[in-house]
Amino acid sequence: MPSIEFDDSKPSWADQVEEEGDEGSLPSPKETVKGNIKTVTEYKIDDDGQKFKIIRTFKIETRKASKAVARRKNWKKFGNSEYDAPGPNVATTTVSDDVFMTFISSKEDLNAQDQDEDPMNKLKGQKIVSCRICKGDHWTTRCPYKDTLGPMQKELAEQLGLSTGEKEKAAEPEPAQPVQNKTGKYVPPSLRDGGTRRGESMQPNRRADDNATIRVTNLSEDTRETDLQELFRPFGSISRIYLAKDKNTGQSKGFAFISFHRREDAARAIAGVSGFGYDHLILNVEWAKPSNN
């Protein structure tokens, strides 16, 4: 009879599983709770027929929930989870941390950002435009008091008997009328009024206009001379404006020439208006090439 030797060492859990049941049977999962630590032990068999043990450790936290959440937790389970224990089943439910959403931007922040990106707001401090009605930093067509102050100013001008155009004409000095020859005798051109003056093309003012003339391109077809007057008037006194128009339609060809009395005013107009958005188009302003005439 062979002798039997007893091993005092602790047996492995795999041997215990084999001794507890037949081959292929697994013990039921065990769950132990010690304080706020819950340990769940499960046994499974892999594809190769090997048995292995899974131990999951959970930390129990007590949280206050609303009454509606507490009632939902007491609902009776159904389907394949009808006989599950209270709480989530690790086989069918994945428990993750709560995600709290933080809204960084709001409508006010978006509106403020849009105002910062608006080129009109960037140009307000430069005083390149001035409303004819309220003298504000915006276009006359966008004046909020256009429907109220505009008619009042027009009525006041009519009561005074002067329109806007008549006021400008009254402020301008009338040109000196040439002295007419009352005797009826023939006067040579050299002795007539203005005969000693040089021709208009020889005048230094014409050359000064060429030096203070700028060229504006990428204008819309609906642009008028009054629009250009309103756009460039804040930079200085304008001597003349030439807007190229189509002979048949009368619409703008997309470019114009503006002459200032001072070259410094023309330089400020180039710096202020070049690259400026007007009537959904980006204006291009540069020095005009001097004429050969």
From Swiss-Prot:
Location of this chain's protein in the cell: Cytoplasm
Subunit structure: Component of the eukaryotic translation initiation factor 3 (eIF-3) complex, which is composed of 13 subunits: eif3a, eif3b, eif3c, eif3d, eif3e, eif3f, eif3g, eif3h, eif3i, eif3j, eif3k, eif3l and eif3m.
Listed Gene3D superfamilies: 3.30.70.330
Name of the protein this chain belongs to: Eukaryotic translation initiation factor 3 subunit G
One GO term (biological process): translational initiation
Keywords: Cytoplasm, Initiation factor, Phosphoprotein, Protein biosynthesis, RNA-binding
Segments forming domain RRM: 212-290
Residue span of region Disordered: 1-32, 163-206
Pfam families referenced in this protein's UniProt entry, alphabetically: eIF3g (PF12353), RRM_1 (PF00076)
Similarity remark: Belongs to the eIF-3 subunit G family.
Function: RNA-binding component of the eukaryotic translation initiation factor 3 (eIF-3) complex, which is involved in protein synthesis of a specialized repertoire of mRNAs and, together with other initiation factors, stimulates binding of mRNA and methionyl-tRNAi to the 40S ribosome. The eIF-3 complex specifically targets and initiates translation of a subset of mRNAs involved in cell proliferation. This subunit can bind 18S rRNA.
CDD domains referenced in this protein's UniProt entry, alphabetically: eIF3G, RRM_eIF3G_like
GO CC aspect terms: eukaryotic 43S preinitiation complex; eukaryotic 48S preinitiation complex; eukaryotic translation initiation factor 3 complex
Biased composition (Basic and acidic residues): 194-206
Domain of life: Eukaryota
Keyword Oxidoreductase: no
GO molecular function: RNA binding; translation initiation factor activity
InterPro entries for this protein: eIF3_g (IPR017334), eIF3g_N (IPR024675), eIF3G_RRM (IPR034240), Nucleotide-bd_a/b_plait_sf (IPR012677), RBD_domain_sf (IPR035979), RRM_dom (IPR000504)
